[in-house]
């Protein structure tokens, strides 16, 4: 089996493939460890999804356990919730090492250049520097993110010619009145017209970011200047980092002996502002589908579609909710009313309690 992409989805899929007895090759295009413009924040149940407790040294020095939400009308709502806070470079590299320990062959700085599918497998053409070779694989798993080479090969029309927008992070080091243990979420269309804008600390670096479908740099500068003034930032921006994709907002799970997982499959939930849990879960479910297909001689993509049905239904439902809530500042404010927040908080508490007893593949992905 060949897994393309050494991020969360790919590393977990590869590790579980090896644990299920499959000879597995995991490919990562870039030299590892590598930075990714991702929050690196997850709820505690994420450890259950990845199947391992995260060592303390793989997490940031500062813990995040408080949330502060700011509404369009400047109402501030506070809550407490334990979160995992990590740099994706450190975390993904650790997941790579777990895969290797399970028996996976891991090659970074290695790219998939082409793949040809047949009835009994896939010919995967790979390149490492000036070395090129063909690998015959029973299955190919595309876990190569929203710029997926695998998906582009089979579904080129899923990609636009130009990116429709971007997310941008400013990394700031210095003094401030911000609380190091709080995740700040600004639900203000003037700062982010598609979801919330964010501020949080990782070790000694503040991450200040936003996203927009149009003019993302203007939104990023405006939000940073707002945060700088409101919270008395005194220091320097050490790095600016952004990400954009031409992938359309569609789900594609694969065909034949090729399965797509994580962001490459389009399993991104902008309403929740999370994708890592879907990535981890889809990686596990893809291997479960392959194992069942091998045992029953059934069509693997049909099994995989069945296993991921709840994920996809939730993404589609949440996409509609997100469009409705961002119709105007009034609809956004209403969605953040005290009643809705109380209801959401109670559901979060219930979900957390249920996740303690639910099996990994049946976990409730939060927030609801």
Put a short name on every predicted segment:
Residues 6, 16-37:
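Glycine-rich FAD pyrophosphate-binding loop
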Residues 41-96:
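A conserved beta-strand/loop capping segment in the N-terminal third of enzymes
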Residues 291-368:
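C-terminal helical "tail/cap" subdomain of flavin- and related membrane-associated enzymes
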Residues 1-9:
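Beta1/beta-strand and adjacent pyrophosphate-binding region of the FAD-binding site
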Residues 6, 98-233, 266:
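Predominantly flavin-linked oxidoreductase catalytic cores and closely associated redox partners
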Residues 32-34, 50-66, 159-164, 301:
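A short alpha-helix-loop-beta-strand transition element characteristic
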Residues 113-114, 214-289:
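FAD/FMN-dependent oxidoreductases across multiple families
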Residues 93, 108-110, 239-241:
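Short loop/edge segments at beta-strand edges and connector loops
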């Amino acid at each position: 089996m060949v897994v393309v992409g050494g991020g969360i989805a790919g590393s977990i899929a590869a590790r579980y493939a090896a644990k299920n007895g499959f000879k597995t090759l995991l490919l990562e295009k870039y030299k590892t460890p590598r930075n990714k413009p991702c929050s690196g924040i997850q709820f505690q149940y994420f450890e259950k999804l990845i199947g391992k407790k995260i060592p303390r040294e793989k997490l940031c020095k500062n813990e995040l356990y408080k949330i502060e939400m700011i509404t369009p009308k400047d109402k501030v709502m506070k809550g407490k919730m334990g979160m995992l806070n990590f740099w994706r470079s450190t975390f993904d590299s650790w997941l790579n090492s777990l895969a290797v320990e399970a028996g996976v062959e891991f090659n970074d700085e290695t790219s998939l250049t082409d793949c040809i599918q047949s009835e009994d497998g896939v010919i995967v053409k790979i390149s490492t520097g000036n070395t090129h070779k063909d690998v015959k694989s029973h299955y190919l798993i595309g876990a190569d993110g929203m710029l997926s080479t695998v998906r582009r090969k089979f579904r080129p029309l899923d990609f636009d010619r130009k990116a429709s927008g971007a997310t941008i992070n400013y990394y700031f080091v210095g003094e401030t009145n911000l609380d190091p243990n709080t995740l700040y979420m600004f639900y203000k269309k003037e700062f982010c017209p598609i979801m919330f804008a964010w501020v949080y600390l990782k070790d000694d670096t503040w991450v200040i970011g936003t996203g927009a479908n149009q003019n993302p740099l203007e939104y990023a500068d405006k939000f940073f200047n707002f945060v700088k003034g409101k919270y008395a930032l005194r220091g320097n921006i050490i790095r600016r980092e952004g990400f954009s994709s031409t992938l359309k907002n569609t789900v594609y799970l694969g065909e034949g002996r090729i399965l797509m997982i994580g962001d490459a499959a389009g399993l991104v939930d902008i309403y929740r502002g999370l994708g890592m849990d879907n990535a981890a879960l889809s990686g596990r479910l893809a291997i479960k589908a392959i194992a069942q297909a091998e045992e029953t001689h059934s069509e693997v993509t049909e099994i995989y579609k069945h296993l991921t049905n709840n994920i996809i239904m939730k993404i589609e439902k949440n996409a509609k909710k997100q469009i409705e809530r961002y119709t105007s500042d009034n609809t956004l404010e209403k969605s953040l009313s005290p009643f809705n927040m109380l209801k959401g908080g109670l559901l979060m508490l219930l979900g957390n309690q249920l996740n303690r007893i639910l099996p990994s593949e049946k976990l409730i992905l939060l927030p609801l």
